[in-house]
UniProtKB/Swiss-Prot annotation:
GO terms for cellular component: ribonucleoprotein complex; ribosome. The keyword Ribosomal protein applies. It holds the Pfam family Ribosomal_L34. Gene3D superfamilies: 1.10.287.3980. Residues 10-19, 34-44 have a biased composition (Basic residues). Keywords: Ribonucleoprotein, Ribosomal protein. Residues 1-44 are annotated as: Disordered. This is Large ribosomal subunit protein bL34. GO terms for biological process: translation. The keyword Flavoprotein does not apply.
Length: 44
């Protein structure tokens, strides 16, 4: 059976990357929430 996690940097960046987050209002909310919490890494 194939494992479910087949890593790809490109797919990761496109769905969870900083620019992907900034592209939508909800994504910007996510970034701002992580900034407010003091996260070292805002996105993948």
């Amino acid at each position: 059976m194939k494992r479910t996690f087949q890593p790809s940097v490109l797919k990761r960046k496109r769905s969870h990357g900083f620019r992907a987050r900034m592209a939508t209002k909800n994504g910007r909310n996510t970034i701002n929430a992580r900034r407010a919490k003091g996260r070292k890494r805002l996105s993948k």
